Amino acid sequence: RNYSLCSNPADRDFYQIAVKRDAAGRGGSISMADDVNEGDLLSVSAPRNNFELHPRATKFLFVAGGIGITPVLSMMRHLKTQGNDQFRLIYCTRDPESTAFLEELQGPEFEGKVEFHHDHGDINNALDFWPVFETPTNAHVYCCGPRGMMDAVADMSGHWPSGAVHFESFGVDASAY
């Protein structure tokens, strides 16, 4: 099974992942949540990056839903290490209690960079992405999360320049994010 790294790519001594336990899943997340502890050594293959920052991009808009924050957080950590703070994150979750990395994202390192949207599990409270994408900017967009959220971002950003909007899919269904 593949998992997105959420650690800074510059940190080569360890890999950090975050896995949401899915009782309805095929067992991978249950095993990771129930049988693996922080600090355990696991046999892994070398990372592959199919969702990388565009090398010439200088401004970034990140959109994450639920545990889709993992690759986005890695990118944000990398940009901060590089001295680039030209980014913004829109992070959609059910509620603050289920928001991964909430404390870090509310901390001083990302102050003023993160907008949280909590739908409380009601699709009628999903974020309206049109105001975000109505006017294209020179930012590159990186989106990872549930299929429904990614479809909404794709629909709202269809008029953006080709190659400016990037998606990472990891098999989450279209239920509320």
Model-derived segments and spans:
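Short, glycine-rich nucleotide/cofactor-binding loops
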Residues: 60-70
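Ferredoxin-reductase
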Residues: 1-41, 59, 93-96, 104
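Short, surface-exposed secondary-structure boundary micro-motifs
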Residues: 47-48
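Short, conserved phosphate/pyrophosphate- and ester-handling motifs at nucleotide-, phospho-/glycolipid
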Residues: 5, 68, 146
